[in-house]
Amino acid sequence: MSEQMPIMRSYLAIKREIPKGTILLFRLGDFYEMFGEDAKISSPICGLCLTRRGDTPMCGFPYYSVNTYLAKFIRCGKSVALAEMVEPTGNGVGRYEVVRIVTPGTAEEENVK
């Protein structure tokens, strides 16, 4: 996916803000998507098919199964940030923010097992 696409610019901006090594789950409609290196790491952990859009690796899963996949990340010692659209901007993309971070240390209190 071209870095020039507005959605990819939003994704990369958030990716730069979160701690290094944290997997970014980016909600697009009814799916959480992972791109680039996060997709390559997530695919085997979660048992997801790694695909590509252009040169960009990607994978994803339905939003309603997020706790199932969070548990898989936590079992592998990975921290995860979930980003969602918090405000439509009228340009078809919207403003995204991290709405939740789950780490191996916080997973139990968030009921992720």
Predicted segments with their positions:
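Basic, polar low-complexity surface loops/patches
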Residues: 1-113
